[in-house]
């Protein structure tokens, strides 16, 4: 409900106050904020992503990862999780490890790998290396890029 008010065109003059309040509430607002990303450009969503990033809580990454399945917002979710920094590494590794256990959605797996590369978390190397022989060329290429970003070679 608060997110609806924050997003309402009639509340533009109070938007700053709503934004501050949403940041103070914390990770619980993430699913609602992610829900309003659809159909908007990254530019239009910059304030929404700023809220998600400023919450700076590993829970936000966990809450955002399922939205990688929605092609409409996936690239924006990749960008936002990448901005969360090291706090998002463990949740992202766990998501990748869960996907490896079953034959999964290749674009989603590719985005998770891309996030790990952007986060540059050395803890991800082992999980990524285990995918270096994956049957999908897209996954192998994403793994190579991510490992290069993490290691620098």
Language-model region placement:
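Structural detector for internal amphipathic alpha-helices that build alpha-solenoid repeat scaffolds
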Residues: 4-27, 32-57, 62-69, 74-87, ...
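TPR/TPR-like (Sel1-like) alpha-helical repeat modules
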Residues: 129-135
